UniProtKB/Swiss-Prot annotation:
Belongs to the LuxS family. It comes from Sulfurovum sp. (strain NBC37-1). The gene is luxS. Signal peptide: none annotated. One of its GO terms (biological process) is quorum sensing. This is S-ribosylhomocysteine lyase. Its cofactor is Fe cation. One of its GO terms (molecular function) is iron ion binding.
């Protein structure tokens, strides 16, 4: 099985909250696609609660589009990581990590301004596969934590695992 890009970086050296360019590629038509690692929690030390990350998923996708989409950037998808330490964001375009961090911070402020559970988009049996598994309180705690700690930028060169180490794992 091929080794995925996300498993060639040293998770013990990741900072959080932080933005990392996980992958850049060109489509056959010449469009640029960038995948960002938006790391909310330090791997193997912290993780977001299930209800909070699910609510954040519903809110974050819309708020990030409001703050980041432009003539040169269009978000394709924002999805939570299975390890519950962050989200992957795939988009058309090549925005700088600092611009992504600024949009992320603005989105977290937007989360804090959501008044009630009723204001969570697509929170119903028809549009959500686990519509009862939500917590606005937990989503707000996650957002506040990001804002309190500040959003850094990760350097892939500093995180890269050596070929020797990878062979031994």
């Amino acid at each position: 099985m091929p080794l995925l890009d996300s498993f060639t970086v040293d998770h013990t050296r990741m900072i959080a909250p932080a933005v990392r360019v996980a992958k850049r590629m060109k489509t056959p038509c010449g469009d640029d696609i960038t995948v960002f690692d938006l790391r909310f929690c330090k791997p193997n030390e912290e993780r977001m609660p299930s209800k909070g990350i699910h609510t954040l998923e519903h809110l974050f996708a819309g708020f990030m589009r409001e703050h980041l989409n432009s003539k040169k950037v269009e978000i394709i998808d924002i999805s939570p990581m299975g390890c519950r330490t962050g989200f992957y964001m795939s988009l058309l375009g090549t925005p700088k990590p600092k611009r992504v961090a600024k949009a992320w911070a603005a989105s977290m402020k937007d989360v804090l301004n959501v008044k009630s559970q009723k204001d969570i988009p697509e929170l119903n049996v028809y549009q959500c596969g686990s519509y009862k598994m939500h917590s606005l309180k937990e989503a707000k705690e996650i957002a506040q934590n990001v804002l309190d700690r500040g959003i850094g930028i990760m350097n892939n060169k500093k995180l890269k695992l050596s070929k020797k180490l990878l062979k031994g794992l």
